[in-house]
């Protein structure tokens, strides 16, 4: 099997996604020792998973993360705010018109907002018309209200989507998260009660363009899927894999942190929240190939050491370090007992801290116990110093350390950083250059006659008016009476004199001086 296990095998028996990286391989199972001849020495092939036993290869296609994929998944959309603009005019007695503009809000609908958004992107002329205030009307001594409902569209407004559960995140959402449940969410409420966020694409899941289709070979054993060879020729096992969905696509997270759209017959458990997927950038892809070259180089060094041993017919415990298996799996362990070369079957595991190998001074933990030494020699070049310390030849590749550190530093976060805060709708009454307003039909309301005064002034004016009218009525009546008197005909002076009478001292009525005079003359 070409170039197998370079990356995955190193993690085969490691706990997934811990903070430490593997530094060594040590047998967790080691069989009885048996003497062998020098000619029976063999170098381990670190590019083969010897404990898989999967030899049947079948071509297939699968999806994996794109090389160069950036962690944040941007979803473009727009915000929609329902605004009611009201123009109120009053015309007073002398014809002076006062206009007052007021602004209120209403909750918009998704369909109306999407129609308004289409107006903007298509350049509909109604968009420009809808930006103006409603044209105010006026009537004498009346208050006229003209209202217009508008939809303010601000775009673009970019939010972030979580690749794991397809949730949307932005500072404009309450608590930073869209409250609508994905993937059926077609709008998200915002911190503004009358503003909603709507994705440009009605199906935001289609915007999750982070996958690429690759071709590889499935590795099976007796019909059981146990791994696959990827497009780069690297073998990856499904041991320790867990189920993980990315952007709604089912797949599996392997123990090395990579993701593949592959499902095992024996359904594994779902990944825990701390088991994140590693991004696949160009640096990681380059390191994977360098690791393969490093493992091949180590095998060549082992073969050179084996050639020297066979040629010189001599061996030292230091040279036995070349025969240690560098990746987890089945292999061999070698030691010297009483100057005799000994061999044992072993199953190697990866360790992440030296204290797992040397828990205490003089103790080499192998096979679940402190392994005994023979004249200060353990196995695979590990010895006991005169001071009682366990000395292990450093076999860790710097490239392997670099690769693991890179993997652990390039996980897809569960929450992504905010895109551009400047795209958030700032104030309730702010209409920027990008604003698009939906223009419904205007509504007019004409009130009754209104003098334009407050309530108490209105009644005071009515009372004064009543008193003024009453006084005017009285004055008018008096004037009319005088006028009528002046227009009556004047009586005859003679008749008037005759009608005048006086009363004498005796009490007898005397009609007038003339009659008295006439009467006196007659008597004489």
Curated annotation (Swiss-Prot):
A lipid is attached at residue 480 (S-palmitoyl cysteine). Keywords: Glycoprotein, Lipoprotein, Membrane, Palmitate, Signal, Transmembrane, Transmembrane helix, Viral envelope protein, Virion. Its main location: virion. Residues 481-524 are intravirion. The chain crosses the membrane at residues 460-480. Glycosylated and palmitoylated by host. Glycosylation is crucial for glycoprotein export at the cell surface. The keyword Membrane applies. The keyword Transmembrane applies. Residues 1-19 form the signal peptide. Residues 20-459 are virion surface. It is found in: Virion membrane. It is a single-pass type I membrane protein. One of its GO terms (cellular component) is viral envelope. Homotrimer. Interacts with matrix protein. Belongs to the lyssavirus glycoprotein family. Attaches the virus to host cellular receptor, inducing endocytosis of the virion. In the endosome, the acidic pH induces conformational changes in the glycoprotein trimer, which trigger fusion between virus and cell membrane. Arg-352 is highly involved in rabies virus pathogenicity. Its mutation dramatically attenuates the virus. This is Glycoprotein. It comes from European bat lyssavirus 1 (strain Bat/Germany/RV9/1968) (EBLV1).
